[in-house]
C-alpha cells in the first residue's frame, strides 16, 4: 500500500494539480502531474479521483485499491514535492490490474517526458 506520507488528501492541492499540472490520458485513466519547487521535507504525494460514473461503492473502492497499489511502485521515481493525481474513467471498472498498470505507466512516461524534456 501507499504510505500515509505519500497520500494526497487536501482538496485545494487536488484542484491545483488538475488545473495547472501536466496531463496525459489513456482509455481507463487520466494522470495530472504538478511539479513544484523541491522541498526536502515534503515527499511526492499521490491522490486518486474515482467518481460514481465508474460504478457502485464496491467497484470504486476496488479500483482505488488497485491504483494505490500500482502507484506505490512509481512514487519513488517522482521528483520531491511533486503532486500526482490519478483520475479513473468509467472503463477502469472493467479493466484488469494489468491493463490499469499499462495505462498508468504510459501516462507517467508521457507526463514525465514533458516535464524533463
From Swiss-Prot:
Keywords: Endonuclease, Hydrolase, Nuclease, RNA-binding, tRNA processing. Its EC number is 3.1.26.5. It holds the Pfam family Ribonuclease_P. GO terms for biological process: tRNA 5'-leader removal. One of its GO terms (molecular function) is 3'-tRNA processing endoribonuclease activity. InterPro entries: Ribosomal_Su5_D2-typ_SF, Ribsml_uS5_D2-typ_fold_subgr, RNase_P, RNase_P_CS. SUPFAM superfamilies: Ribosomal protein S5 domain 2-like (SSF54211). PROSITE patterns: RIBONUCLEASE_P. Gene3D superfamilies: 3.30.230.10. One of its GO terms (cellular component) is ribonuclease P complex. It catalyses: Endonucleolytic cleavage of RNA, removing 5'-extranucleotides from tRNA precursor. Transmembrane segments: none annotated. It is an enzyme of class 3 (hydrolase). Signal peptide: none annotated. NCBIfam families: rnpA. PANTHER family: RIBONUCLEASE P PROTEIN COMPONENT. Belongs to the RnpA family. Consists of a catalytic RNA component (M1 or rnpB) and a protein subunit. RNaseP catalyzes the removal of the 5'-leader sequence from pre-tRNA to produce the mature 5'-terminus. It can also cleave other RNA substrates such as 4.5S RNA. The protein component plays an auxiliary but essential role in vivo by binding to the 5'-leader sequence and broadening the substrate specificity of the ribozyme. This is Ribonuclease P protein component. The lineage of its organism: Bacteria, Bacillati, Actinomycetota, Actinomycetes, Propionibacteriales. The gene is rnpA.
Amino acid at each position: 500500500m501507499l504510505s500515509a506520507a505519500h497520500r494526497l488528501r487536501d482538496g485545494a492541492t487536488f484542484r491545483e494539480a488538475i488545473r495547472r499540472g501536466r496531463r496525459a490520458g489513456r482509455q481507463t485513466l487520466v494522470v495530472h502531474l504538478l511539479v513544484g519547487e523541491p522541498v526536502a521535507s515534503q515527499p511526492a504525494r499521490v491522490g486518486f479521483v474515482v467518481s460514481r460514473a465508474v460504478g457502485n461503492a464496491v467497484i470504486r473502492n476496488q479500483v482505488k485499491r488497485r491504483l494505490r497499489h500500482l502507484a506505490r511502485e512509481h512514487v519513488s521515481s517522482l521528483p520531491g514535492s511533486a503532486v500526482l493525481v490519478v483520475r479513473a474513467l468509467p472503463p477502469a471498472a472493467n479493466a484488469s490490474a494489468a491493463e490499469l498498470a499499462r495505462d498508468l505507466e504510459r501516462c507517467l512516461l508521457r507526463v514525465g517526458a514533458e516535464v524533463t524534456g
